[in-house]
Amino acid sequence: MARIGFYGRLAERFGREIGIDLPDDATVATVRAQLGGLDPATIRALVNDATASEQTSVGPGDRVDFLPPLSGG
């Protein structure tokens, strides 16, 4: 099971953290598809605290964080 963390408006939608089961060949794109509505053009992904691409592998025990655009000053 992978842990998925959400911040900002995403935490309001999904909660701060959930666990999901993934196939053996899962990637960040797989996680986005399973959750739905996480546009890669605007929502940044981190895997185990490192910036991730859509092709980054995600396995059991990994943590994926999704961060919406930040604003303010």
Task: Set out the residue ranges of the language-model regions.
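Ubiquitin-like/PB1-type beta-grasp interaction modules and other compact soluble beta-rich domains
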Residues: 1-72
